Amino acid sequence: MSNYDKEIPPEKAELVDRRAFLEVAAGAVAGAAVSGAIPEIAAAQNSGSDRGSGPLYMQTNEIQNAIIHYRRDGGGALTEVERVLTGGAGSGTFKPISGQASAPNAFEGAGSVILSPNRQLLFTTNGGDNSVSSFRVGKDGRLTHADVKPTGNPVKGKSGTAKSLAYAPSKGILFVVHSFGPDHVRLMSVDAQGTLGMRPERYTVNTQEKTDRVPTMGVLSPNGKFLLVGTTFDQSIAHTGLYPDGSPILWVPQPDGKYRVIASNAPDPDGLVLFPVQDDGTLGGAKFQDAKAASPFYIAFLNGRPDAFVIGYAVGNGCAMATIDSDGKINVGPLVKIDTSPGLPSELCWLSISPDDRTVYATDFGYSYISSYHINGSGLKIAKDPACPKVPGDGTARGLNTTVTSGPSDCWITADGAYLYQIYGNASALVGYATRSDGSLHEINRVKIPYNSPQGLTGF
């Protein structure tokens, strides 16, 4: 009998020790740090005199959704420049992924606000009504609304779930990922002016046996040949229900009477989903690959190594280095776990990689702080855990580990690696940090943002 299929009498299900079980789930691969010398971070990251300025963009995800445009000065401080309506609807404080009336991280996703590589267009999802908006970006970073179009997926219930974007400019195609399927991935056409067009193609990350999977984000490989999609649940927590204490049910009965954790890739080797990108921008058949640990939430390619990427695991509680070859075969290295003493799972869900590919910053939703890794050759090593003090929320939000959280979600690092910005939704705060060569973060700026709803960060 598999460790993941232990028989549990239904009357005992509510007494399950979730920490013990999630330790099993997280152990789909044993974590191991790769030792070796850590090179010093470039001096540009430590000197304030040559740090540049630029725009930073975040979506409010309010019912009347808007993009907030901040101006980042040479010292990293943020000043709000404008709020531009998207023409679409967000989910507000409602969290569709769990059905909670008010909670941070509405969609369990990443990459909801992105820029085109030439920085002339900005795209954002509108999760409330399943639409996408485009903007033209001026030389000063100011936004001009270009278009808004539905993704093609109908809204069921109180909100849609469009949440992650990837853009292939050479093909004029935008890939849109939704939390709920079966049509998880939809395509939209884009022209040079940002005009959007709905397309009929639709793709799923479900399998024949798993018909309620929840993907997290879509990322194009640097060569544009593959769309990689991360996953977090094999069954949505909005559909599994709650324990009497209000925490989500993470173990569900199977037809054979056994119970299984709903975290993806725990242990079935199918948590990473790869779609070949065809010449016309449409996708080939899905290939399900082993992520080697539970809930491979975030995928971040290195800046200088187009065949290498880092995976952040929400239930695996750590990160791993991975490579992809020209045929799309993925090889995942050892999992390097963070300290999980605050509770399991950590919900390590978002990553930012420094431009010199030496440091990874990992956002821990369940712990209300950020951890950091150093990239050492082909592996990872913990740098600072935590890398910054915990940011408290208002006490109303809890992670899957039942601990109170401020709900940190998307983060973004500047092109010079000098500053990192982090959303703490339940604290109504966007926090700016100065990076340090040892992997630690020093808070330099904090601005008030809408409560619980904001998501998505990008800039230049």
Q: Which role does the model predict for each range below?
A:
Residues 51, 88-115, 152-170, 206-226, ...:
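Beta-rich, blade/repeat-based domains predominating
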Residues 71-77, 136-142, 187-196, 275-282, ...:
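Short loop/turn segments immediately following beta-strands, especially the blade-tip
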Residues 54, 230-266:
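Short, conserved, GDST-rich strand-edge loop motifs in beta-rich repeat architectures
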Residues 15, 36-53, 57:
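C-terminal segment of N-terminal export signals and the immediately downstream linker at the start
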Residues 61-62, 72, 127, 179-180, ...:
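Short loop/turn segments immediately following the C-termini of beta-strands
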